[in-house]
Amino acid sequence: MAESKCPFKSQGSRSNVAGGGTRNTDWWPEQLKLNILRQHTTVTNPLGADFDYAAAFNTLDYDALKKDLTALMTDSQEWWPADFGHYGGLFIRMAWHSAGTYRVFDGRGGAGQGQQRFAPLNSWPDNVSLDKARRLLWPIKQKYGDKISWADLMILTGNVALESMGFKTFGFAGGRADTWEADESAYWGRETTWLGNDARYEKGFSGSDKQGTVIADEASHKTTHSRELENPLAAAHMGLIYVNPEGPDGNPDPVAAAHDIRVTFGRMAMNDEETVALIAGGHTFGKTHGAAPADNVGKEPEAAGLEAQGLGWQNSHGSGKGPDTITSGLEVTWTKTPTKWSNQFLEYLFKFDWELTKSPAGAHQWVAKNADDIIPDAYDAFKKHKPTMLTTDLSLRFDPAYEKISRRFLENPDQFADAFARAWFKLTHRDMGPRARYLGPEVPGEVLLWQDPIPAVNHALIDTVDTAALKRDVLATGVNPSKFISTAWAAASTFRGSDKRGGANGARIRFAPQRSWEVNNQPWLQESLSALEGVQSRFNASRPDRKQVSLADLIVLAGCAAVEQAAHDAGFPVRVPFTPGRMDASQDETDVESFSHMEPIADGFRNYAKPYVHGRAEHYLVDKAQLLNLSAPEMTVLVGGLRVLNTNYDGSAHGVFTSRPGVLSNDFFVNLLDMNTAWQAGHNGEIFEGADRKSGAKKWTATRADLVFGSHAELRAVAEVYASADGQRKFVNDFVAAWNKVMNLDRFDLQGKQFIYPRL
């Protein structure tokens, strides 16, 4: 009988089916990509548009779930045995690595979307074996279904792991709804090899194509004590969460490693004390795995065959599991009680002198000199080992600032436990945004500064009669309405859908650091705020019925009033929706350093860019639009509207393609697409001049963030809709809808459902 053959032969990634072949990005790698504006919509969500995760979570039998998770910790499975009979260390690492991708500059990364399930994170070298952790969790996820997301479950499991080993956690908040596709918006770096860092650092390491170990670059780099990490990255190597545990580029120098630790943890919003607490606390538990060289480790999950069913890194050494496990390539157990909370990590750190050695996989690590064999083996009860440490562990002793904190924690175990509990909570909740999003019975009562607290509403809210009167008062102040639009936009557009920070609520635009940001044009901002504070003061003083208006509400209302006036002047009267309920935060409730990372380096909506920006304005525009949860049509209509409303940050005429600035017309699109205008690039390729094709008379000036709507084929297609003879009404309506969306992105108090404004 002839041999049976599978009819579907592998054709690689470029097969002759839909999505295969040579793609646009192959022909034009620098083409502006709009795909990040089309992600995470209801189309990709199998639970449907009406699914309300918050409501589902609130029906969860939370105590039963925690009991099941606690039981799992010691239910060792033959297919992936538990170190020391306890999965605690593995699940702490899973939760840490889910949350630890967060970075302060753009708020991307973090645990909030459950992205560890998808590429590239599911295949990063730093996440070896976490595929097994999630599979161990699957029966519990399967049992509780939609009531607990993967994003929440991974973090809660880390908490339960800590509690099951005797540690008292600070609390837990649910509310992380899953996404259903890989997030394409995060910039993870430009390196094309695992563990490379030659793009993020001026003198870095080229990386490797090997899996399952941290590769050491034996070259001595003098810059490792002071090198600058590319923004917005918060990891020292492609495919690592933070730093190379062997030391910078694999060089076992604890002092140089401290520099990388301080930078990477700082970019994850952690100060020195939180950093020491996290490293020392996390390394109280479990072990690392480096039983043999990385040559024994197979393909990562995304490269493995179908038969692997999403698992990767098949290990050919011995049994490939248990005592034969290869994960980081390091073989370190820090304490003699790796399944119990203790102070032993810090005790051993200072008790012993340490000498450099190598793991069975060939990775640099450290062993205690002249120490007894006191560390248990993970699988052989009759076997003991000498204490071992990572290069980055020793940084806590040999960096002067870290040492001071470490010794204080050593002498004050209660301080250490409290610091670790708080730092762990911050690590795992940093990207959740305000407390209004927190769900569940273990939400801590203490309000923390990094949560950007806003006072609860403590007065009666204004009604439609009041809003109408306030709008009249605002427009009667004599301030150019464009400045009210600019102020409202400046306040609301600080929102980041990535970590749910920013927005108009709190009126923090009147405080440091936002009030002095160049993009906010402080003189104009102050003029607008002073006028609004006067309106607010007069209104609040005149009300005997406890009705008050917050400045945060008034900033948004003033912008809405100005937009309505501009639409009326265009001949299309419209009502801009407004919902009161915002409150005013104080300067003391504003973490200045934390908010300083949110200052835009470019904002195409206001034609702003810092002089040292290396990227193209149109790319930064799309980046900003994605953070605002905007679609391509929403981005398009907002830019076109803001230009004719004359809201450029510096009052320039770039992109103001109209003879009637301040009127909400579709002139931007009409004039941009006018073939009677010929464009010429300036000397720097950032500013352009448009002249009449026949006479050569200068007509307009523009930036890249303006002309992209006529240059980019997909954006031009949208622009044509608004430039059409019947497009004015649609333009006004769509602008108002998109404006309202941005003004309310941070109104989680209104979002009883898992709320996402519809995209145009």
Curated annotation (Swiss-Prot):
Biological processes, Gene Ontology terms: cellular response to hydrogen peroxide; hydrogen peroxide catabolic process
Co-factor requirement: heme b
Residues the record marks as site: Transition state stabilizer: 93
Location in the cell: Cytoplasm
Entries under InterPro entries matching the protein: Catalase_peroxidase (IPR000763), Haem_peroxidase (IPR002016), Haem_peroxidase_sf (IPR010255), Peroxidases_AS (IPR019794), Peroxidases_heam-ligand_BS (IPR019793)
Crosslink (Tryptophyl-tyrosyl-methioninium (Trp-Tyr) (with M-268)) position: 96-242
Catalyzed reactions: H2O2 + AH2 = A + 2 H2O; 2 H2O2 = O2 + 2 H2O
Domain of life: Eukaryota
Covalent link (Tryptophyl-tyrosyl-methioninium (Tyr-Met) (with W-96)) residue numbers: 242-268
Post-translational modification note: Formation of the three residue Trp-Tyr-Met cross-link is important for the catalase, but not the peroxidase activity of the enzyme.
Enzyme class: oxidoreductase
Signal sequence, renumbered to the chain: none
Family: Belongs to the peroxidase family. Peroxidase/catalase subfamily.
Assembly and binders: Homodimer or homotetramer.
Stated name of the protein: Catalase-peroxidase
Gene for this chain: katG
